[in-house]
Amino acid sequence: MMKTLALYGLTLALFFLSGAHSAKITFTNNCPRTIWPGTLTSDQKPQLPNTGFVLASKASLTLGVQAPWKGRFWARTRCTTNSGKFTCETADCSTGQVACNGNGAIPPASLVEINIAANRGMDFYDVSLVDGYNLPVSVATRGGTGDCKATSCRANVNAVCPAELQVKGSDASVLACKSACTAFNQPQYCCTGAFDTARTCPATKYSRIFKQQCPQAYSYAYDDSTSTFTCSGAPDYVITFCP
């Protein structure tokens, strides 16, 4: 019995010394239609137990994420199952299932990116339109210390999306807005090759459209100064689609 207690105490001590804690991430769907959020863990780490799920209008769901953790979240729209294969018209992850199983969203997709620190250290989080836009989204913290400001892209970017960036549905409505990188695959838009630094890859007329609509969100790869947010002390997070 004493040996069991000693081992339990050692395990508990190692747990706290390692800085392990679990952050709660709550997803809320304020959109008028059902969405299918997806999750992707970065850095070749194991995926979360739940990599995709259905979320009805006005519904919420909470996932626990063990720190340290880094990854992204998005929502798929207009999804259907035909002949046993699940597909979505925007932000599909191409698994044929609701679960994304380590696949990311096919652009365009509005993203929430979170880097949860160990030792209750400084987390980083953002809303990113680097891969384009499909839905309004926000992320806010609960608890934590420091700045801990909410960030969002609340605008309907689809309404002002240039024709050359538009993704249209079968009914001719604009479902999503591509990034210039996705649309044209040119290094000056993708910040690659000779354009792979902040100095050589400035904002473009296309990224400025995203920035004008959503000033807090990343509009292209080097849009860090106004788009990255921080919070320390092991906060929880609330991600709201159509805030």
UniProtKB/Swiss-Prot annotation:
Keywords: Antimicrobial, Apoplast, Disulfide bond, Fungicide, Secreted, Signal. It is found in: Secreted, Extracellular space, Apoplast. Coiled coil: none annotated. SMART domains: THN. One of its GO terms (cellular component) is apoplast. Residues 1-22 form the signal peptide. Pfam families: Thaumatin. Its main location: secreted. Possesses antifungal activity. Belongs to the thaumatin family. This is Thaumatin-like protein 1. It comes from Castanea sativa. The gene is TL1.
